[in-house]
Amino acid sequence: MSSGKVVQVIGPVVDVQFPLSESLPDIDDALKVKREDGTELVIEVALELGDGIMRTVAMDSTDGLKRGAEVEGTGASISVPVGKDTLGRVFNVLGNTIDNGPEFDEDHPRNPIHRDAPKYDQLSTGIEILETGIKVIDLLAPYIKGGKIGLFGGAGVGKTVLIQELIHNIAQEHNGISVFTGVGERTREGNDLYFEMKESGVLEKTAMVFGQMNEPPGARMRVALTGLTLAEYFRDVEGQDVLLFIDNIFRFTQAGSEVSALLGRIPSAVGYQPTLATEMGQLQERITSTKKGSVTSIQAVYVPADDYTDPAPATTFAHLDATTNLERSLTQQGIYPAVDPLASTSSALTPEIVGEEHYEVATEVQHVLQRYRELQDIISILGMDELSDEEKIIVARARRIQFFLSQNFHVAEQFTGNPGSYVPVEETVKGFKEILEGKYDNLPEEAFRLVGGIEDVVEKAKKLAGNN
């Protein structure tokens, strides 16, 4: 293995000089360097500067590094443990366990985090819907097995809670395996998620990988690849359908932009790295269905200042099959999950994939909600009395639909005190069809808020009538 010396440290970026007589390490190779206190730091080769100098990115803090420190090549890229033993465990970017449990042996199967996307002849072309049990998603923006789904929303609108609910529903109802990757988010949230999942029994079906806010950009930039490598093993070797959760894909881009300038690259639009589209493509192209199994990815996308034209969310958009847009105005009305029924989209919402009835009900729901949105200006200026009888019916049904799109979550039970609900797709379609037909026009609007199926609405209406 080639060995060199540290010649410069600029924050998370370390320059290493190798003797010209030796072969240089490859791009993306992992190198090891000892700090003054004897601890080991892993750095990854990013660029060759010439004269035997390689510019690298550190996977941990560079505190305690000094010029002249010995650097050893490993001859390979970072590799992480894979297999069934990873379920129920928590890892960092390097594949080291961080849950106080036993470490994995050196001879445990490991895969490199840098890999090529599956070849075209390995890809599966069939389309299958993934039922989530969340009404607004299953009805208006259904998820595809092996697809890529974006959860868009600003700060504090409920992206992480929605992800937790999806993990819960997939584990409990579908017995599915999930890999949760925390990229640059709050450590407290990761900690809470771990203990909540342990309590609810979901953890045995989930592997967790974290590179949180307090970690250097190198770790945040590579941790998504670590999570993806774990998921790929279950797809390619075990032949399973895996859910890969990434919270938050924006932080992956943000970490790349933090190191980009230090690596000497000229920034592009809004200060992002010029390699933004390439980095995103290398990650996203590996997330797909093959003939052996599938990786379905659900990615929370933080939208800076709620600006969807920002290059980071805009680049992510290009790769997605479905989008779930969370809207702050809905949280203010107490509608949870705060999914915007008109802005959320899915390429699977076609009669050929979801069926004729589902498609017709979904488009009619969107039509009624769109008409209600148009009428709101008239209502706010002139009041309800100025509407025609037909428009009054549309408004009444739209409000019932809007409330019926909300539901209680299992993972929020401890905060709300209300039990969560899982609603099968057939029941969801049936409920909305009956509301559109006017079957429940006589029930109070409040009966539709935060309930499961349509039977729950009737029950709640009886309770409300009893209380009055």
UniProtKB/Swiss-Prot annotation:
GO cellular component terms listed in the entry, alphabetical order: plasma membrane; proton-transporting ATP synthase complex
Enzyme type, top EC level = translocase
Q: Where in the cell is it found?
A: Cell membrane
Q: Which PROSITE patterns match?
A: ATPASE_ALPHA_BETA
* Key words, A-Z: ATP synthesis, ATP-binding, Cell membrane, CF(1), Hydrogen ion transport, Ion transport, Membrane, Nucleotide-binding, Translocase, Transport
Please give the superkingdom of this protein's source: Bacteria
> Catalysed reaction(s)?
ATP + H2O + 4 H(+)(in) = ADP + phosphate + 5 H(+)(out)
What quaternary structure, including any partners, is listed in this protein's UniProt entry? F-type ATPases have 2 components, CF(1) - the catalytic core - and CF(0) - the membrane proton channel. CF(1) has five subunits: alpha(3), beta(3), gamma(1), delta(1), epsilon(1). CF(0) has three main subunits: a(1), b(2) and c(9-12). The alpha and beta chains form an alternating ring which encloses part of the gamma chain. CF(1) is attached to CF(0) by a central stalk formed by the gamma and epsilon chains, while a peripheral stalk is formed by the delta and b chains.
Q: Which family does it belong to?
A: Belongs to the ATPase alpha/beta chains family.
The protein, known as:
ATP synthase subunit beta
Species source reads: Ligilactobacillus salivarius (strain UCC118)
